[in-house]
């Protein structure tokens, strides 16, 4: 399994690049539009990769950061979401915007991605609602845990999100206490 490739970009297209390693091996790697915008031909970089082996192809998908790679890997595990659709999500939404859409149940944001309709957006949200903590960084994880706890207490997500915008606490326990005071 190839988990990362370091080398010089010898070819760059909007969603594809070729990386030549110091050993002379060149790898063709599919990339998101966001990744493409941040790299230049002739530049030495390291791309984290997800490798997909098929009967007719050995495909590499490249990412500049771990969050985008995790987002891609979570998406391709879902029934009916292939690598091309997952890359379309990576190209259309940052990992933070994607996470926000999952947390808020925002199908409108997900349907802006080519190839994702309302039904698929609802399924993505439903299937990833438990896995969203994997995508979160430390600053978001306590908010996700707080939202989950408050929902378990019977509060509605939209009301919780509005209250959390005005909360200042930086850990789960304090944020739950602060939110409960404002929700009461």
Swiss-Prot record:
Q: Please cite one Gene Ontology biological process associated with this protein.
A: DNA repair
User: What Gene Ontology molecular function terms does this protein carry?
Assistant: ATP binding; four-way junction DNA binding; four-way junction helicase activity
Enumerate the residue ranges of region (Flexible linker).
145
Domain II, as annotated region: 65-145
Q: Which CDD domains does this UniProt record tie to the protein?
A: UBA_RuvA_C (cd14332)
User: From what superkingdom does this record's organism come?
Assistant: Bacteria
The entry's keywords = Cytoplasm, DNA damage, DNA recombination, DNA repair, DNA-binding
**Where is region (Domain III) located?**
145-184
InterPro entries per UniProt? DNA_helicase_Holl-junc_RuvA_I, Hlx-hairpin-Hlx_DNA-bd_motif, NA-bd_OB-fold, RuvA, RuvA_2-like, RuvA_C, RuvA_C_sf
Q: Does the record's keyword annotation contain Methyltransferase?
A: no
Q: Specify where the region named Domain I lies, as residue ranges.
A: 1-64
Chief location bin: cytoplasm
Q: Where in the cell is it found?
A: Cytoplasm
State any GO CC term.
Holliday junction helicase complex
Q: Which family does it belong to?
A: Belongs to the RuvA family.
| Subunit description | Homotetramer. Forms an RuvA(8)-RuvB(12)-Holliday junction (HJ) complex. HJ DNA is sandwiched between 2 RuvA tetramers; dsDNA enters through RuvA and exits via RuvB. An RuvB hexamer assembles on each DNA strand where it exits the tetramer. Each RuvB hexamer is contacted by two RuvA subunits (via domain III) on 2 adjacent RuvB subunits; this complex drives branch migration. In the full resolvosome a probable DNA-RuvA(4)-RuvB(12)-RuvC(2) complex forms which resolves the HJ.
Describe the function of this protein.
The RuvA-RuvB-RuvC complex processes Holliday junction (HJ) DNA during genetic recombination and DNA repair, while the RuvA-RuvB complex plays an important role in the rescue of blocked DNA replication forks via replication fork reversal (RFR). RuvA specifically binds to HJ cruciform DNA, conferring on it an open structure. The RuvB hexamer acts as an ATP-dependent pump, pulling dsDNA into and through the RuvAB complex. HJ branch migration allows RuvC to scan DNA until it finds its consensus sequence, where it cleaves and resolves the cruciform DNA.
What does the entry's domain section say?
Answer: Has three domains with a flexible linker between the domains II and III and assumes an 'L' shape. Domain III is highly mobile and contacts RuvB.
Q: Write down what this protein is called.
A: Holliday junction branch migration complex subunit RuvA
